[in-house]
Amino acid sequence: IIDEQLLWFAYTQSGDPVAFFIVIPDLNQIIKHLNGRLNWWGMIKFLLLKMRGALTRACGVIFGVVPDHQGKGVESAIALRFRTAARENPFYPYETMDMNWVGDFNPKMLRFVSQLGATNEKTYITYRLFFNPDQPFSRCPKVG
């Protein structure tokens, strides 16, 4: 289920696509009320909950900019437009947005998230267990 308010694309003046930002509604807010049953009654209940406004959270899924246009303000323009569109629309149903799995090795994406006005509420830590303890460990290099 995709909400058109959450899909953003950027184009050049000639009409070539240069960037996109795709966000989806967090359907877990509704699915938890179905108790794992997505039968006919579950589908009706799903639609009723959706129409009633049970979806208040969205999840940022993917963001990308064509390499030739990176660092030219396209990222900031999408972030600013997304943010103002949400604030200007009185019927905008989403109160929060999760931007999961933005690694600390990706400073460009961290900057984009901060431009959206986001705060860091969760930090995920990935642990490694080497079967060969003599193998050297190297951290993931920074992107960009």
PLM features: residue spans?
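Terminal substrate-recognition subdomain of acyl/acetyltransferases
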Residues: 3, 13-14, 46, 51, ...
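Short conserved micro-motifs at the rims of enzyme active sites and ligand-binding pockets
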Residues: 32-34, 70-73, 110-111, 137-140
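A conserved beta-strand-loop-helix scaffold within acyl/acetyltransferase catalytic domains
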Residues: 1-65
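Generic structural motif recognizing short loop/turn segments at the entrances and edges of beta-strands
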Residues: 16-17, 56, 74, 123-125
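Conserved acetyl-CoA-binding loop-helix of GNAT-fold acetyltransferases
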Residues: 57, 61-87, 115
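Short linear motifs at secondary-structure transitions and domain/linker junctions
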Residues: 33-40, 73-75, 100-106
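Short coil/turn motifs at secondary-structure junctions
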Residues: 26-28, 68, 104, 132
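Aromatic side chains
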Residues: 20, 69, 124-127
